[in-house]
């Protein structure tokens, strides 16, 4: 049996963006960590606190502060066009990026340049050249830079990997998936997030990651089809 580490440490988190992804994933996580902390016998107890957030207007941060009702320690809210720069400079240890996709690269780059570890919601960036730059920057500064795929925690995703790990699912020749959703989702709920996206970065990243998560990257080809005129003009990008 390994020895128990009784050391107590702390991590200060920064949050970029406080929209739907924050509400559904990060908010409950930070509230649970505030109540219970993080513990494992090999690294001991870690107090993880949300200490800085960055948003464009500050409205969501103010509303969350009001509704938190003691479930979270107080945090500093930065707003405006330079909110990310000020948040990553606020003495945090790591930053979580959950802003609209076309802002991921700048926020992640600022975090790494400031010496912060980075967690980025999928898709990490919208251009592979940007990903190369972030990877190089993280390696140069010896920092963690990871992409979050929240759907890997879905029961069906975990079940599929379990079938592979248990040797019940041995080989797959072909797989097929489709996305059917009302136009109101992309034109309304996700309207701000749609800028610069394509079918690959919008949702296919989930399925590609599921294959990687399940089969360990043994993927040969990916093909994607779409329709024009769904999100944009009929002669624009394919969706």
What do the predicted segments below correspond to?
Residues 1-114, 136-140:
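N-terminal glycine-/serine-/threonine-rich beta1-alpha1-beta2 phosphate-ribose binding loop
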Residues 27, 61, 131, 157, ...:
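A general structural signal for well-ordered alpha-helical segments in protein cores
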Residues 101-102, 124-125, 178-181:
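Short glycine-enriched loops at secondary-structure junctions
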Residues 115-117, 121-123:
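Short helix/strand-capping hinge loops at secondary-structure junctions
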Residues 119, 144-146, 176:
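Structural detector of well-ordered beta-strand residues that form the stable sheet scaffold
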Residues 123, 146-152:
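Rossmann-like NAD(P)(H) cofactor-binding subdomain of soluble oxidoreductases
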Residues 124-144:
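Rossmann-fold NAD(P)-binding glycine/threonine-rich loop
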Residues 151-234:
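Predominantly a Rossmann-like dinucleotide-binding segment in NAD(P)-dependent oxidoreductases
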């Amino acid at each position: 049996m390994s020895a128990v580490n009784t050391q107590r440490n702390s991590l200060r988190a920064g949050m970029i963006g406080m929209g739907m992804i924050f509400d559904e994933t990060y908010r409950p996580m930070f509230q649970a960590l505030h109540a219970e902390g993080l513990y494992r016998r090999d690294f001991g107890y870690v107090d993880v606190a949300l200490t800085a957030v960055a948003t464009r207007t500050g409205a969501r941060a103010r509303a969350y502060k009001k509704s938190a009702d003691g479930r979270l320690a107080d945090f500093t809210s930065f707003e405006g066009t330079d909110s990310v720069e000020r948040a990553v400079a606020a003495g945090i240890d790591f930053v979580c990026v959950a802003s609209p996709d076309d802002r991921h690269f700048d926020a992640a780059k600022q975090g790494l340049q400031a010496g912060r570890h980075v967690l980025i919601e999928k898709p990490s960036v919208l251009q592979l050249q940007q990903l190369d730059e972030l990877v190089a920057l993280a390696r140069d500064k010896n920092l963690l830079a990871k992409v979050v795929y929240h759907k890997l925690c879905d029961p069906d995703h975990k079940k599929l990997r379990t079938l592979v790990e248990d040797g019940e699912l041995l080989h797959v020749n072909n797989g097929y998936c489709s996305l059917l959703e009302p136009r109101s989702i992309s034109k309304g709920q996700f309207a701000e997030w749609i800028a610069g996206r394509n079918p690959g970065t919008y949702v296919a990243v989930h399925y590609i990651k599921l294959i990687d998560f399940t089969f360990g990257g043994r993927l040969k080809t990916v093909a994607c089809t779409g329709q024009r005129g769904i999100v944009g003009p009929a002669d624009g990008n394919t969706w």
